[in-house]
């Protein structure tokens, strides 16, 4: 079964074509600057060179057709015709409370995704555009949507409710939803496999650390808490996002800085985080280089970030009544041995620690704890596209018997 996996952003489309017989990636690609000057498709057949196609891409409909044309191109394509695509799997950021699992696309599902757009105004509309574009191009091919929020729908009320009047939850759905669910789900399953069991056997803390970062408590296969909240702004200090702050800072900014709601949103989402603390960059590679040169604020930004992650590890260990494994994933979690080491400093009380030699791992699944550790520590590259493809196959086989 061949699955076309699509992730549509506001001005981009990422895609993979995966043969699920062996879970082999046949090709992947990225279209950038949709609706802008200088748009480009970077298409990479597995094991071959990347093809750059510079062409105006006015919208997602055109972009999806361009991607499929690349897949069937006689020179750099990997299938002979579009009819070889058996199903399409889409990433959708926010499913609200309506969607607690991946689903086959119907008219009701499309309406539901649109209704959740107010919860993710930057993400759900382009996600929906991608679904509609694929439906128009391949009307007979089943479409499945996989929600970032779905994995966290197993959180209990005590974890997802805020200390606000209950009416806000009833009227507007104001609660913790959590994000990066597809990534947290994948790496928890991989960690369990590496420990020789099922994910339902273990208590695992998953740390998805990149420009956007979150931590999740996965207890016996189910998410029981996560750091992001009603929006992806909550929780950890991130690249440009503040993470959790005292809510009274917002009226303070209104009075002292004469900010309106839009300006505050910009301030907290795009000018804060390690960028705001360092005054230099949101890229941890830049911060580490500057810190090595003696830049104190860059070092401070790194320290604040690592400390917040460590706090969540401690909190989620308590919430689960213990922990069997800690997993680092995403760009920073997978690739920064120094950040993993800093976060894990002082975890000896859990009966674990980082092995400096094993911790040099990059780009592959690796156990990085000291020998004999009671709590395993892993660095695991995430693979959200594979989770989307797996869910797509499972739903298609269960519902339409493909």
How would you describe each model-predicted region?
Residues 299, 303-319, 323-324, 333-402:
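Internal helix-turn-beta structural module
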Residues 219, 224-260, 266, 330-361:
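Catalytic phosphate/nucleotide-handling subdomain of diverse soluble enzymes
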Residues 9, 91-93, 209, 323, ...:
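Glycine-rich beta-strand-to-loop/alpha-helix junction loops that act as flexible
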Residues 70-85, 193-198, 313-324:
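Phosphate/pyrophosphate-binding loops at sites that engage ATP/ADP/AMP, CoA/4′-phosphopantetheine
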Residues 12-57:
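Short glycine-rich, Thr/Ser-proximal phosphate-binding strand/loop in the N-terminal lobe
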Residues 71, 75-123, 144, 150-159:
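Short beta-strand-loop/turn "lid" adjacent to the catalytic site in phosphate-handling enzymes
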Residues 151-256:
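Glycine-rich phosphate-binding loop of actin/hexokinase-like ATP-binding domains
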Residues 266, 273-277, 284-319:
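Adenine-nucleotide phosphate-binding core of ATP-dependent small-molecule kinases
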């Amino acid at each position: 079964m061949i699955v076309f996996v699509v992730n549509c952003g506001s001005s981009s489309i990422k895609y993979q074509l995966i043969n699920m017989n062996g879970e082999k990636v046949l090709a992947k690609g990225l279209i950038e600057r949709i609706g802008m000057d200088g748009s480009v498709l970077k298409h990479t057949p597995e094991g071959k060179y990347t093809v750059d196609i510079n062409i105006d891409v006015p919208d997602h409909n055109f972009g999806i057709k361009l991607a499929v044309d690349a897949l069937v191109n006689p020179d750099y394509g990997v299938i002979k015709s579009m009819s070889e695509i058996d199903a399409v799997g889409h990433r959708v950021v926010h499913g609200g409370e309506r969607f607690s699992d991946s689903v086959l696309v119907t008219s009701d599902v499309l309406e539901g995704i649109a209704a959740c757009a107010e919860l993710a105004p930057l993400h759900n509309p382009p996600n929906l555009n991608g679904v509609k574009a694929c439906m128009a191009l391949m009307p007979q091919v089943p479409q499945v949507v996989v929600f970032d929020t779905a994995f966290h729908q197993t959180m209990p009320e005590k974890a997802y409710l805020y200390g606000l009047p209950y009416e806000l939850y009833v009227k507007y759905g104001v609660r913790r939803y959590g994000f990066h669910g597809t990534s947290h789900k994948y790496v928890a399953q991989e960690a369990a496999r590496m420990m020789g069991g099922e994910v339902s056997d273990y208590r695992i803390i998953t740390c998805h650390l990149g420009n956007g970062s979150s931590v999740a408590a996965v207890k016996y296969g189910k998410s029981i808490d996560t750091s992001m909240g009603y929006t992806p702004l909550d929780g950890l200090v991130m690249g440009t996002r503040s993470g959790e702050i005292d809510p009274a800072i917002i009226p303070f900014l209104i009075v002292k800085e004469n900010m309106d709601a839009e300006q505050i949103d910009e301030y907290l989402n795009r000018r804060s985080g390690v960028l705001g603390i360092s005054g230099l960059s949101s890229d941890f590679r830049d911060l580490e280089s500057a810190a090595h040169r003696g830049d104190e604020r860059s070092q401070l930004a790194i320290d604040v970030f690592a400390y917040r992650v460590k706090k969540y590890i401690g909190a989620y260990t308590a919430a689960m009544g213990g922990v069997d494994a800690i997993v680092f994933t995403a760009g920073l979690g997978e690739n920064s041995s120094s950040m993993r080491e800093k976060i894990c400093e002082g975890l000896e009380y859990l009966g674990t620690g980082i092995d400096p030699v094993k911790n040099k791992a990059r780009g592959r699944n690796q156990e990085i704890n000291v020998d004999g550790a009671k709590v395993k520590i892993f660095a695991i590259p995430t693979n959200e596209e594979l989770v989307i493809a797996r869910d797509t196959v499972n739903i298609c086989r269960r519902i339409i018997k493909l």
